[in-house]
Structure formats: structure tokens, C-alpha cells
Amino acid sequence: MKKILQGILTSTIVMFTAACDDELKPDNFSGQLTETVTAKPVNDFLNSIGINTAIYTRGETLDKTIEGVKDGGFRWVRAGYEGTAFFNNGVFQKLHDETGVLFSYGMGSGGTDTARVMADARKLHEMGAFLAFESLNEPNNWGIIWDGEAGGGENSWLPVAKFQRDFYARVKSDPVMSQYPMFGISTIGAENDNVGLQYLTIPEGAGTLMPDGTQYYDYGNCHNYAFGGDNDVLRDNQTWLASSPGNDNPFDGPYGNFVKTWAKGFLGYDEETVVNMPRVSTETGVTIHTGVDEDMQGRMFLNIYLSQFKRGWAYTSIYILRDRIDEGGNQTYGFYAPGYVARKAAHYIHNFTTILADDRDKSTTAGTLTYSIPKKPETVHHLLLQKTTGKYYLIIWGERYTGGTNNISISFDQNMSSVKVYDPTIGTEAISTHNNTGSISLEMGVDIAILEIEK
């Protein structure tokens, strides 16, 4: 776990009758006012939504974890063997059976027991519940011993690199488990020596301490928390920027891990490659602190999932389901407070995933929708999804965290037979319905509008 940010704004989505004349910028429309957009399956987005939880240890209970995971609609859980003496097959089986979640499974902090991870992962595979392997958690904070050598932290990272090489090779040599991807080491931007962990596979001529061609992982992994500490001040587009693969990301993002490492400046991929590289976030989030109350935290959580998916992250796991009770400092990261008291974030994610719920066993034939958002503010973003029913879901969200609102209009190339507008911070029922309409107007500050569209 780690970082923080602040802000204040809680405006409700309000329907307006006319578009505004604010000075705005188009977003991802290639400079065009109107574009035909291919929808992504709703299930692809929902499958990306993950959560950190200790499940049944560290003061958490299985029944409450099941309740929280089911209510939140989370599709995967980040797990590992850390803190457990053995794999509790019954716990994982029950959590999977009652919620349908899959599990990433890994070493945790300071662990190197590859045999244990392989055996546990195989059991998850056998129950149809395995998603991916995960490697070391933040070896800058929790070093390891590999082949008798200390690595990570202030030591050389060569033992870390050798461990990862060996772990990856072991997974990929297994005739059954090799089908699953490896999520990489987190916070590798901290490496003290240039062992090449900034690459998935070290390319020819990289000049690293490990040889060219060394294979490490299938997905880059960041812990890109959307804040930098309890004293930070919220900025506009904060969660959008935290999801950026570029050097405009002020947090622990892909640029500082895979392009130019933030600790020692070791060079890795070029920026264009990182934009398109497979990547995940096994930890992100924000605490409650000055400027970020329960409402703002809940809105930011939804914006994190949306921004991450829109900007190319395959999987995102927010830290954490329920606040830690065995660690010091500000631990208000959770959807639930100690005692499993639901915060507003828990209600918002429930409403959000309920509105978007779809049959995960069916496939979606990608359709297109032609629309525009004239004079769109740079703090307004959009994502087009489609359910297996054929209905489109255009999600519009605002990141004007410093205050104020903008009036915007979404215009379609033809009249839509029905457009229903949902606000997940209010509930699961539509707040307005529009028939035979060619445009919808909204007021956006730090708001989320889900438009259910039937042509």
C-alpha cells in the first residue's frame, strides 16, 4: 500500500435543456467533433475491476469478504500466500463459488517460495478460479533472499532479477500453468542497479546487468495510487493523470517504471511502446483525508476504474476492501471501515456494477455508435461499452476536482429510440428517460453519468 490526494466537490448530475459555450477541448476524437466509436464489451470492463483483500486473515472474515465482494460486483481478487501456513482450499472455493471471482496469486512481500505458489495456483486452476501469477510486492520496501544473496531495498537488485527470471521460467515450463500470465514486480522503478526489470523481456543491446533476452513477465505492474500523501492538494484530472502511461503522470506510473526509472534514471522502453504494453495495477486507491471525504473517495474509486480501463490497463485492483486494523497511520483506504461498516464507496460501486451487470457467459458482437461532445472540457472523459443484449452504455465522467461544473451536450448522428440516464451515486434506477432524442445535456463536475442507449 501507499499514497494520497485531496479535493472537494459533490455535484449531482443535472439535466439541462441546452449545451454551453465554455472553452473546451475534444477528448480522444482525433480532433474531430464527431466520430464513430466501436464499443468495448461491458464484460471486458467489469472483468478488469479487482479488489485487494486478506480474505480471512488479518482480522478479515470469509463471510464478510464474500458479502463485500458480491455486493461490490468485483470480478477478481488479488491474493497470495503471505501470512498463511497453508493453502485453504475451502476458503478459496467458497469465495469463488459464491461470487464468481477469479484470483491473481503471488509472493506477497518478501516471499520467494515458488513451489508454494505453483502448488496453490494449480489448485485455483483446478477449481476454475485462477487468473494470473503475481511476482514480488514492492521489493524496495521488502527485500528478498535468493540463492543466499540479499536483494532489493538498498542492496543490489541482481538477486531480485535472478529470482524473477527463475520464477518466470518455472511457470512457463509447466505444461498446465504456462497458459496463465505473469503480473510483474511492482515499483521496479526503485531498482538500485540496472538489472533490466524495466523490461518484460530484455531487448538486444539494452546494456543491462542481466543478459539480453532475459524474460521476466507478461504484464508490467504499477502501484499507481491516485494521490501523493495526506498533505497533497487535489488537482483536476487527478485520477485520469494517475492512469496515464506518459510522463505527465505525477505518481508511480508506467513512465517512471518502464521508460526512465524514477530512482536512478535507467532507460527502458520508449513512450510509444509503454502506451501499448500489457499492464496491470495490483494496488491503487486513495484515503479519506483533508479535502477527500467519503463521497469524494467513492467518486474517485469509480473514476480510477474508468480511467484505468480507458487508458489501456487490463486489470485494476483497488486497495482495499476493508481497512487494515493491524497497521499504523491513515488506513482509510477501504470500501468498508473496520467492523465492515460500508462507506459511500461501497454503495457507489454496488450501484455502478449493478447498472452495468451483464451475462459473463455470453459474448458481445462489437457495435458502433456515432456521437460527439462539442467543446468538451479536458476534465470530462467518456467510455463506450456494449452489453450482450446489444444495448450501448456511454459512460461520461468528470474530474473537475478543484471545483466548479461544466454544461456539456452529447449529440448523436440520429435520434435514439431511448436514452436512460443513471447516476451510480444515487442508486440503480434511471434518473431520467428520453425517447426519440438526438442529444443529451449534462452538468459535470466530479460526476458520473451512465447513458443506456437503444438505437
Regions found by a protein language model. Give the residues of each.
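Carbohydrate-binding surface patches
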Residues: 370-415
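C-terminal beta-strand-rich structural cap/linker in extracellular carbohydrate-active enzymes
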Residues: 433-455
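Aromatic-lined substrate-binding rim segments of carbohydrate-active enzymes
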Residues: 63-67, 74-131, 151-186
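Short, acidic/polar
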Residues: 55-71, 114-124, 194-210, 297-305
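Bacterial Sec-dependent N-terminal signal peptides
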Residues: 14-39
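Aromatic/acidic polysaccharide-binding cleft in carbohydrate-active enzymes
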Residues: 286-377
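Noncatalytic carbohydrate-binding groove/subsite architecture in carbohydrate-active enzymes
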Residues: 156-304, 311
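Hydrophobic faces of well-ordered beta-strands that scaffold small-molecule active sites
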Residues: 47-53, 77-79, 101-107, 131-135, ...
